[in-house]
Amino acid sequence: MTLLYEGKAKRIFSTNQENELRVEYKDEVTAGNGAKKDTMAGKGRLNNQITSIIFKYLQENGIESHFIKQLSETEQLVKPVKIIPLEVVVRNIASGSITKRLGFENGEVFREPLVEFFYKNDALNDPLITDDHVKLLNIASDEDIEILKSKALKINNVLKQLMDAMNLKLVDFKIEFGKTETGQILLADEISPDTCRIWDKATNANFDKDVYRNNTGSLIETYQIFLNKLEDLK
């Protein structure tokens, strides 16, 4: 078993199977592209368990991903994919960077979901880019761009239904996709309160990493409550 990659939140290892990788979730939390960073016991367990439940739910609703199964509290087994260097962001309600960029009021509900692409490049601070930029950078073709948008909107519909069942609002989320050796585009990485903005329906209280970004509560307690809500749906 060889360490293949280590990022801010995860380590990826080879296995004795050519078509399987092991992902280990770390106890680190970051914000502001790593400008703010802490280690919190239990964070890896929570994100792994939440992502495993959500990926299984998405698969049950026709959305394929790299996820195979959960191995332990902090580990999961996944299919190897070549990550497309884009963060695909879907926004249902205005919050975060879009309020500063375009002047929307925080909490303003969009008429329809907005899909944005951000170029995964730490040196450039992950800039927002257009479809034409995506093609110019040879990241994806016209066909792939349409597949990414279509999959992102389908994921949005399924996640909104899931959050609605927990009396929560899906404000926005970011996802990543990868390509298999045969060129199939699969959902990859994770879906957790690290990668979503989630509000309580009644109070608009955060159930996401904004409690850490804005120092408004305990990240571990917030994520545990969210996990409990997910598990209560089983």
From Swiss-Prot:
Coiled coil: none annotated. It comes from Staphylococcus aureus (strain NCTC 8325 / PS 47). Transmembrane segments: none annotated. GO terms for biological process: 'de novo' IMP biosynthetic process; cobalamin biosynthetic process. Its EC number is 6.3.2.6. It catalyses: 5-amino-1-(5-phospho-D-ribosyl)imidazole-4-carboxylate + L-aspartate + ATP = (2S)-2-[5-amino-1-(5-phospho-beta-D-ribosyl)imidazole-4-carboxamido]succinate + ADP + phosphate + 2 H(+). This is Phosphoribosylaminoimidazole-succinocarboxamide synthase. The gene is purC. It is an enzyme of class 6 (ligase). Pathway: Purine metabolism; IMP biosynthesis via de novo pathway; 5-amino-1-(5-phospho-D-ribosyl)imidazole-4-carboxamide from 5-amino-1-(5-phospho-D-ribosyl)imidazole-4-carboxylate: step 1/2. Keywords: ATP-binding, Ligase, Nucleotide-binding, Purine biosynthesis. The lineage of its organism: Bacteria, Bacillati, Bacillota, Bacilli, Bacillales. PANTHER family: MULTIFUNCTIONAL PROTEIN ADE2, SI:DKEY-6E2.2. It holds the Pfam family SAICAR_synt. One of its GO terms (molecular function) is phosphoribosylaminoimidazolesuccinocarboxamide synthase activity. Belongs to the SAICAR synthetase family.
